[in-house]
Amino acid sequence: MWDYSEKVKEHFYNPKNAGAVEGANAIGDVGSLSCGDRLRLTLKVDPETDVILDAGFQTFGCGSAIASSSALTEMVKGADLDDALKISNRDIAHFLGRLPREKMHCSVMGRERLQAAVANYRGEELRTDHEKPQLICKSFAIDEVMVRDTIRANKLSTVEDVTKHTKRGGGCSACHEGIERVLSEELAPVARSSSCADQGQEEVKVLAPSRLRSWPRRLRATPKLSNLQRIRRIETVLAAIRPTLQRDKGDVELIDVDGKNIYVKLTGACTGCQMASMTLGGIQQRLIEELGEFVKVIPVSAGPRQMEV
């Protein structure tokens, strides 16, 4: 169970500025619906002063994504665009009191979304250090520049740290070698700088790529589960979530499990609720954490599928 601050809980249970802003003239989208972390930021900017008059968010993600989005909209309202762009993911986490390290990627995505919205308002392409940055993580469409920026901003030093802060690399692990390469390149100048500052001391040693490649093995591998075991774990997660939904006169029912697709049916007050996408996103995130794999939660309005064990 993650250790959430009271402010994170406040912004999750009572999110500020949820929904799209009417008359928005800046829109920033990041993430992927298929991966359960789609985020949209809408801003209403005064064209005379570039001051953000209003901000709203829509998210298909976990509780930390909702809280980070809520916090970001509160932070940017009343700021001009240049000042808003100075907000870092660490500022968002600080505003919330703290975020678990495993959830820092939610604040990183908030910053990405703000950058995208400002670029959209200004009619610009998002500028990077390279004209055609190399794609590091194909599962989440994240490029090398964003990985480098996150490493620098948060002083990261391991592959595990990068996956916790960006949620990239936590799926198929195919991008770990690329992350290792970027880490070794980013850490090398720091070591050389320390060495040059005091030439009388022994040169600082940097982890070689072969040493860095040992880090992915620290990530706990989840044993392959049988279909019955997966269904039981899924039902356990839904049973833990159900009391919260029932307090609001809603409920959730497992309909079917087909590989990485998990079909559920929202009932009662949850049917047609404006927060239904957030509820599904929270369920999906809990299932990902429990199963140790990326799954997709798909809502069904009726139960034409019969669960097969």
Curated annotation (Swiss-Prot):
GO terms for biological process: iron-sulfur cluster assembly; nitrogen fixation. [2Fe-2S] cluster binds at C137, C172, C175. Belongs to the NifU family. Keywords: 2Fe-2S, Iron, Iron-sulfur, Metal-binding, Nitrogen fixation. May be involved in the formation or repair of [Fe-S] clusters present in iron-sulfur proteins. The keyword Metal-binding applies. One of its GO terms (molecular function) is iron ion binding. Binds 1 [2Fe-2S] cluster per subunit. This is Nitrogen fixation protein NifU. It holds the Pfam family NifU_N. Its cofactor is [2Fe-2S] cluster. It comes from Azotobacter chroococcum mcd 1. InterPro entries: BFD-like_2Fe2S-bd_dom, BFD-like_2Fe2S-bd_dom_sf, FSCA_dom_sf, N_fixation_NifU, NIF_FeS_clus_asmbl_NifU, NIF_FeS_clus_asmbl_NifU_C, NIF_FeS_clus_asmbl_NifU_N.
